[in-house]
Amino acid sequence: MEGGAALYNPRTVEEVFKDFKGRRTAIVKALTTDVQEFYQQCDPEKENLCLYGLPNEEWEVNLPAEEVPPELPEPALGINFARDGLSEKEWLSLVAIHSDAWLLSVSFYFGSRFSFHKEERKRLFNMINDVPTIFEVVTGMAKAKDKSSAANQNGNKSKSNSKVRTSEGKSSKTKQPKEEDEEIDEDDEDDHGETLCGACGDSDGADEFWICCDLCEKWFHGKCVKITPARAEHIKQYKCPSCSNKRARA
């Protein structure tokens, strides 16, 4: 396994950051929306396994590269061995921490390989640092920081103000794209900009459809959890993939 190196070699700061975001999105997906499948693939009875995030936003659990040294830095080895010795939350947090370290090592490997100078390395780090870590997304810290930031900016503004109203007048835990719902007040739009997706961890997507989980109250891009506005209209209580998986295993 070469961590997706065969797909392309990013040579500029922007290309390396795009590679970073693709791999990060893939791993966040594995640890959140695809967590049940990821959990099953990490069988402690198997050999040393690694979690790879690929630039095309796909993830895979696989054996480490056979060549020594590998072409790219390798992710943490043997993540499957700790699965049954820790609680699910602790284990996922551990995998997230090691994945964050791996993403940085891959990005700065490219930086060294293509001789980024000091200012380019600094710019790359700042671009990466502006994105929530996988650990923050998986543990909910990113959402907590977002709420804290919103509270500081909006004072004692009620949490319910971030919930828009449907045309029928009933409360709906969804956020429509700006062009589809121009009646959302300015404060709601500010809140939307502060919100981080519970699946991909990004705060962008103000022009996209969002939905909120009724159990954990995290917001998600509709595309990240495969929910369309039309489908959302028929959902009385939405449960995100993580909450659904927890209830299924309980």
From Swiss-Prot:
Question: In which domain of life is the source organism classified?
Answer: Eukaryota
Q: Which InterPro entries match?
A: Alfin, Alfin_N, PHD_AL_plant, Zinc_finger_PHD-type_CS, Znf_FYVE_PHD, Znf_PHD, Znf_PHD-finger, Znf_RING/FYVE/PHD
Q: Which residue ranges have biased composition labelled Acidic residues?
A: 179-192
Q: Name one GO biological process term.
A: chromatin organization
Give the intrachain disulfide bonds: none
- UniProt cross-references to Pfam families, sorted A to Z: Alfin, PHD
Residues modified to N-acetylmethionine? M1
Keyword Zinc-finger in the entry? The reply is yes
- Give site residues, Histone H3K4me3 binding: W210, D214, W219
Q: For this UniProt entry, what's an example GO CC term?
A: nucleus
What are the boundaries of the signal sequence?
A: none
The residue ranges flagged as biased composition, category Low complexity, are 149-163
The places in or outside the cell where this protein is found are: Nucleus
Region Disordered: what ranges?
A: 146-192
The GO terms this record gives for MF are: histone binding; transcription cis-regulatory region binding; zinc ion binding
UniProt note on tissues of expression: Ubiquitously expressed.
Q: What keywords are assigned to this protein?
A: Acetylation, Chromatin regulator, Metal-binding, Nucleus, Transcription, Transcription regulation, Zinc, Zinc-finger
Question: Which residue stretches are annotated zinc finger (PHD-type)?
Answer: 194-246
Annotated family: Belongs to the Alfin family.
Swiss-Prot/TrEMBL domain comment:
The PHD-type zinc finger mediates the binding to H3K4me3.
What is the purpose of this protein? Answer: Histone-binding component that specifically recognizes H3 tails trimethylated on 'Lys-4' (H3K4me3), which mark transcription start sites of virtually all active genes.
Protein name, per record: PHD finger protein ALFIN-LIKE 3
Give the species: Arabidopsis thaliana (Mouse-ear cress)
Q: What is the lineage of its organism?
A: Eukaryota, Viridiplantae, Streptophyta, Embryophyta, Tracheophyta
